Design a protein with these regions (language model features):
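Active-site regions of metal-assisted phosphoester/phosphodiester hydrolases
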Residues: 1-74, 78, 90, 101, ...
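Cell-envelope and extracellular/periplasmic
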Residues: 84
Length: 262
């Protein structure tokens, strides 16, 4: 075998290795959400927010059905999605953009990992209202293929800034640094909503240790001690909270109605 063939095979093996690995992504930032929906300035007295781990739209029946997910998402103003499917050689659009277009809403797909050079998996946001800006931060350390991030979305609510943070974290036993970083970011804003799947209940020691002291669990009245999906708020009042059972996904849909603190 000639040297040129050896070099060619070596490059091919390196390429196959790089393409088959799930890679984290770099920090990104932007201004506006995507979509053709007209920019609405939110002036209402209350805002409905939700968090939903959509499990790639695969329900407990094994069927992948994005329509069932969209039916729940459309009931709220701002919805943070986790475990959203990205694009690939055979998928032109990520699931956040598909839901956004189905509902005529603004949307953003926040890539957590790349596979075969495509944004394969991530979180997402579906919103009735446009952002002032947003920024995505990768979270480390990560384990295996489970790369994580958080995205901070900056909204203006009747002239008042409100930050909405969306994330999906691994269990604290696999590393507490990502949770600490998310909670630190959450504590930087006077009015903030933290959405996501934390893979830990609110009473977990790490959650209690890192949460800002003035944090309110918007879903506390639902009486689900083992819940790992969170809507946490600061500088905001919770009017009511509700959930919808598993079925369209292996996670329930959780929502809350909030308002500014006078």
């Amino acid at each position: 075998m000639t040297a040129s063939w050896i070099i060619l095979i070596a490059f091919a093996l390196v390429g196959l290795f790089a393409a088959s690995r799930a890679w984290p992504v770099r920090p990104t930032h932007g201004v506006r959400l995507n979509g053709e929906h007209e920019d609405d300035v939110f002036e209402g007295s209350t805002l409905s927010v939700a968090t939903y781990n959509i499990h790639r739209a695969r329900g407990l029946d094994g069927e992948k059905n994005l329509d069932r997910i969209a039916e729940l998402v459309k009931t709220c103003d701002v919805v943070g999605l986790q475990e959203a499917e990205g694009t690939s050689l055979f998928r032109r659009h990520d699931q956040a953009s598909l839901i956004g277009r189905m509902l005529g809403r603004l949307f953003h797909f926040s890539t957590t990992r790349r596979l075969l050079f495509f944004p394969q998996r991530g979180n997402g946001l579906i919103s009735r209202f446009q952002t002032q800006s947003w920024e995505t931060t990768p979270l480390f350390p990560s384990t295996g293929r489970a790369h994580r991030n958080m995205t901070v979305y900056h909204f203006e609510w009747a002239g008042v800034p409100v930050a909405v943070i969306n994330t999906h974290l691994s269990k604290p036993a696999e590393g507490e640094s990502p949770l600490e970083e998310v909670m630190h970011a959450f504590g930087q804003f006077p009015r903030a909503v933290l959405l996501g799947d934390f893979n830990a209940p609110v009473h977990h020691g790490a959650m209690r240790r890192f949460m800002p002291s003035d944090t309110k669990d918007a879903l506390s009245g639902l009486d689900d001690q083992d819940r790992v999906d969170m809507i946490l708020v600061r500088g905001l009042k919770v009017d009511q909270a509700w959930s919808r059972p598993v079925g369209p996904s292996d996670h329930p849909f959780f929502a809350a109605q909030i308002r500014p603190v006078n």
